């Protein structure tokens, strides 16, 4: 097995600093984007509800048209 390589404390500090800054940035960015994504999901759900309602109405009208033609 190869012995571990000695790494400068300055390089270690730089690596851990970059890691910490990346985690902090990611948390900040996530907290910034989370409300926007929730709003987009809410709007998409409302639009889907409206589309489903329109499709249901169209289907009922089509069935009513078929029933009236056949009778």
From Swiss-Prot:
Compartment list: Mitochondrion; Mitochondrion inner membrane
Phosphoserine modified-residue sites: 68
Cellular component terms per the entry's GO annotation: mitochondrial inner membrane; proton-transporting ATP synthase complex
InterPro entries found in the cross-reference section: ATP_synth_F0_esu_mt
Keyword line: Acetylation, ATP synthesis, CF(0), Hydrogen ion transport, Ion transport, Membrane, Mitochondrion, Mitochondrion inner membrane, Phosphoprotein, Transport
Stretches of the chain forming a coiled coil according to its record: none
Main location: mitochondrion
Example GO molecular function: proton-transporting ATP synthase activity, rotational mechanism
Source organism superkingdom: Eukaryota
In-chain residues carrying the UniProt-annotated modification N6-acetyllysine: 34
Recorded family membership: Belongs to the ATPase e subunit family.
Assembly and oligomerization: Component of the ATP synthase complex composed at least of ATP5F1A/subunit alpha, ATP5F1B/subunit beta, ATP5MC1/subunit c (homooctomer), MT-ATP6/subunit a, MT-ATP8/subunit 8, ATP5ME/subunit e, ATP5MF/subunit f, ATP5MG/subunit g, ATP5MK/subunit k, ATP5MJ/subunit j, ATP5F1C/subunit gamma, ATP5F1D/subunit delta, ATP5F1E/subunit epsilon, ATP5PF/subunit F6, ATP5PB/subunit b, ATP5PD/subunit d, ATP5PO/subunit OSCP.
Protein name stated in the entry: ATP synthase F(0) complex subunit e, mitochondrial
Organism: Sus scrofa
Taxonomic path: Eukaryota, Metazoa, Chordata, Craniata, Vertebrata
Designated gene of the protein: ATP5ME
